[in-house]
């Protein structure tokens, strides 16, 4: 659905730009930032965090950890410290926990609170309050927690944790790192072993970080391709020093912009290429994208690398549905790349996008059509008809309060024949506070009040 043509106070227009050139560092990984604060709050002692993403979502989690009893402080050098209260030591908050737009923060903290004998009310913005929480509520109820929520398990909801949390064995009905992590967080304060069984691998930042903080966690290959994760409850978590690598989901926007804008060559330094997060980059290379992986290393248990990206002629492909979990947040910007490719790009098995910050399939398809690109939408995916580098642009796109929709179509505007306007760019601050400044530094042109 296109927005009205008059610009709102937070609208932003991306104009066709010259070559994007330079080296950038994107903000710290959002998934790892949330978890660093949460596990720091559960450790005994001081955890130091460098590179924390200071977007609105992560800052909401930091404030939540304070309300649950941890001391969380930002220092002048940009590092953060968390003085934890230990597993089982959370205090009951004296006011609602406000997660803003952050589904990750809300779901992880539900798991955390479910394992403690306290009551907390969870609230969020209009977008988060539309998102279903039932898939988290179901397993946490098995641990002994109780919930009072709006219809469909939506926020605001009140959660009372178990007086004595039960260790459970839970098989994930759909691939979801958030549900997996919520169950493991609840299991931390349960006696015995909590087991999670996955049919499809999902991002494993929680498992990696639990190990780093000293928890006993085992990950094994089970029968018929299943993955079995076992966590021994009631550990004493030890504080850590964590360096948060760059977020591959944020890096996706400058990377795709450089691929699509003629003459571009950029380097993105220090992003995590965790195999459960790198699906977009694999896909772009299969499409013919000139992406060189350099300086591979490991930092804080996470694989990290630099990327050199050069403008490329892309071709359409069929994205394997099994890859969806490793790139679920990147489909909107992949659809932009597909619009400039030669031939069709088929993206199926992504029904999960219907219940993100917006219905991302519908929002992406609508934005593509508004800019002259043909797209065929189905219940669980879309097929984009590429225009071989000749995307008309000129459209006004409704973002539906979704940061990834906003950034994706701003990327389109840099490479299209005419400018592209998004109706609301304010929410970009939830995940990528310096998006416009960083992109301008590479040569991108943006016009509008939302900066």
Curated annotation (Swiss-Prot):
Active site annotation, chain numbering: 329
PROSITE patterns according to UniProt: EPSP_SYNTHASE_1, EPSP_SYNTHASE_2
Gene Ontology BP, a term: chorismate biosynthetic process
Pfam families attached to this UniProt entry: EPSP_synthase (PF00275)
Binding sites annotated in the UniProt record for phosphoenolpyruvate: 30, 103, 131, 178, 360, 404
Enzyme class: transferase
Subunit structure: Monomer.
Top-level lineage group: Bacteria
Protein name: 3-phosphoshikimate 1-carboxyvinyltransferase
Cited InterPro entries: Enolpyruvate_Tfrase_dom, Enolpyruvate_Tfrase_sf, EPSP_synthase, EPSP_synthase_CS, RNA3'P_cycl/enolpyr_Trfase_a/b
Keyword Cytoplasm: yes
Keywords: Amino-acid biosynthesis, Aromatic amino acid biosynthesis, Cytoplasm, Transferase
Catalytic reaction list: 3-phosphoshikimate + phosphoenolpyruvate = 5-O-(1-carboxyvinyl)-3-phosphoshikimate + phosphate
Cell location: Cytoplasm
SUPFAM superfamilies, alphabetized: EPT/RTPC-like (SSF55205)
Pathway involvement of the protein, from the record: Metabolic intermediate biosynthesis; chorismate biosynthesis; chorismate from D-erythrose 4-phosphate and phosphoenolpyruvate: step 6/7
GO cellular component terms, semicolon-separated: cytoplasm
PANTHER family for this protein: AROM/DEHYDROQUINATE SYNTHASE, PENTAFUNCTIONAL AROM POLYPEPTIDE
EC number: 2.5.1.19
GO MF entry, a single one: 3-phosphoshikimate 1-carboxyvinyltransferase activity
Keyword check for Oxidoreductase: no
Role according to the record: Catalyzes the transfer of the enolpyruvyl moiety of phosphoenolpyruvate (PEP) to the 5-hydroxyl of shikimate-3-phosphate (S3P) to produce enolpyruvyl shikimate-3-phosphate and inorganic phosphate.
Binding-site positions, 3-phosphoshikimate: 30-31, 35, 176, 178, 329, 356
Record family assignment: Belongs to the EPSP synthase family.
């Amino acid at each position: 659905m296109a927005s009205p043509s008059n610009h709102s106070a937070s609208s932003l227009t991306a104009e066709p730009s010259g070559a994007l050139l330079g080296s950038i560092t994107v903000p710290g990984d959002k998934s790892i930032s949330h978890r660093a604060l949460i596990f720091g709050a559960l450790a005994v002692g001081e955890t130091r965090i460098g590179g924390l993403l200071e977007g609105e979502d992560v800052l909401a989690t930091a404030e939540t950890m304070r309300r649950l009893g941890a001391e969380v402080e930002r220092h002048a050098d940009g590092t953060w410290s968390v003085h934890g209260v230990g597993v089982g030591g959370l205090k009951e908050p004296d006011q609602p926990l406000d997660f803003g737009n952050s589904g990750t923060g809300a779901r992880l903290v539900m798991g955390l609170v479910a394992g403690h004998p306290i009551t907390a009310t969870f609230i969020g913005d209009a977008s988060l309050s539309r998102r279903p929480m039932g898939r988290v509520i179901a397993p946490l109820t098995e641990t002994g927690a109780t919930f009072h929520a709006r219809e469909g398990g939506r926020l605001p909801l009140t959660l009372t944790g178990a007086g004595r949390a039960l260790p459970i064995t839970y098989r994930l009905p759909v691939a979801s790192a958030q549900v997996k992590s919520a169950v493991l967080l609840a299991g931390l304060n349960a006696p015995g072993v909590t087991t999670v069984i996955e049919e499809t691998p999902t991002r494993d930042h929680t498992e990696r970080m639990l190990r780093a903080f000293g928890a006993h966690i085992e990950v094994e290959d089970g029968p018929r391709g299943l993955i079995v994760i076992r966590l021994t409850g009631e550990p004493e978590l030890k504080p850590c020093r964590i360096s948060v690598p760059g977020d591959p989901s944020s890096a996706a926007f400058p990377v795709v912009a450089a691929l699509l804008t003629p003459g571009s060559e950029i380097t993105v330094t220090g992003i995590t290429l965790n195999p459960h997060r790198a699906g977009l980059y694999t896909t772009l290379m299969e499409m013919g994208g000139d992406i060189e992986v350099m300086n591979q290393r490991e930092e804080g248990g996470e694989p990290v690398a630099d990327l050199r990206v050069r403008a490329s002629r892309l071709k359409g492909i069929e994205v394997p549905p099994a890859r969806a979990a490793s790139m679920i947040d990147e489909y909107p910007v992949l659809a932009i790349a597909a619009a400039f490719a030669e031939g069709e790009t088929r993206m199926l098995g992504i029904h999960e996008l219907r219940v993100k910050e917006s219905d991302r399939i519908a929002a992406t398809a609508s934005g593509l059509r508004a800019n002259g690109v043909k797209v065929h939408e189905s219940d669980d995916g879309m097929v984009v008809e590429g225009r071989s580098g000749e995307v008309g642009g000129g459209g006004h796109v409704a973002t539906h309060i979704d940061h990834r929709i906003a950034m994706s179509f701003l990327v389109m505007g840099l490479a299209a024949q005419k400018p592209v306007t998004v109706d609301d760019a304010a929410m970009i601050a939830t995940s990528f506070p310096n998006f416009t400044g960083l992109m301008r530094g590479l040569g991108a042109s943006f016009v509008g009040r939302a900066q």
